[in-house]
Amino acid sequence: MLNAEDKKLIQQAWEKAASHQQEFGAEALVRMFTAYPQTKTYFPHFDLSPGSDQIRGHGKKVLGALSNAVKNVDNLSQAMSELSNLHAYNLRVDPVNFKLLSQCIEVVLAVHMGKDYTPEVHAAFDKFLSAVSAVLAEKYR
């Protein structure tokens, strides 16, 4: 699915985003909750207002998991296994939500990376986030 050039583009782009995990993650979550309000049902115990400590903390976790995925791009299933178990068996998150969050992450990256978020980077990230979403949904089968 991901070729060598895709992996290179993902790693280069992620180097620019990695130091902004909390900020970008929180922004992606707020975008998701705004664009897809049904996703709020998975967070009944959270203060969902933009900038809340819970949103910022979870945003950092989400992008931290993506950092792990970038580092382990050739072994996503093993790297994301624990997270897949958590979302499938404990949290019971509908897998469609992974795609919704992926879209929001792509928007945040595009906004903040500007001209560095080229069509090639976009295509590589789209494939990468699709692969991550598929791995997270593996345990549902």
UniProtKB/Swiss-Prot annotation:
Residues 1-141 form the Globin domain. Pfam families: Globin. Keywords: Heme, Iron, Metal-binding, Oxygen transport, Transport. Red blood cells. One of its GO terms (biological process) is hydrogen peroxide catabolic process. One of its GO terms (molecular function) is heme binding. Heme b binds at residues 58, 87. Disulfide bonds: none annotated. CDD domains: Hb-alpha-like. It comes from the Eukaryota. PROSITE patterns: GLOBIN. GO terms for cellular component: blood microparticle; haptoglobin-hemoglobin complex; hemoglobin complex. InterPro entries: Globin (IPR000971), Globin-like_sf (IPR009050), Globin/Proto (IPR012292), Hemoglobin_a-typ (IPR002338), Hemoglobin_oxygen_transport (IPR050056). Involved in oxygen transport from the lung to the various peripheral tissues. Heterotetramer of two alpha-D chains and two beta chains. Belongs to the globin family. This is Hemoglobin subunit alpha-D.
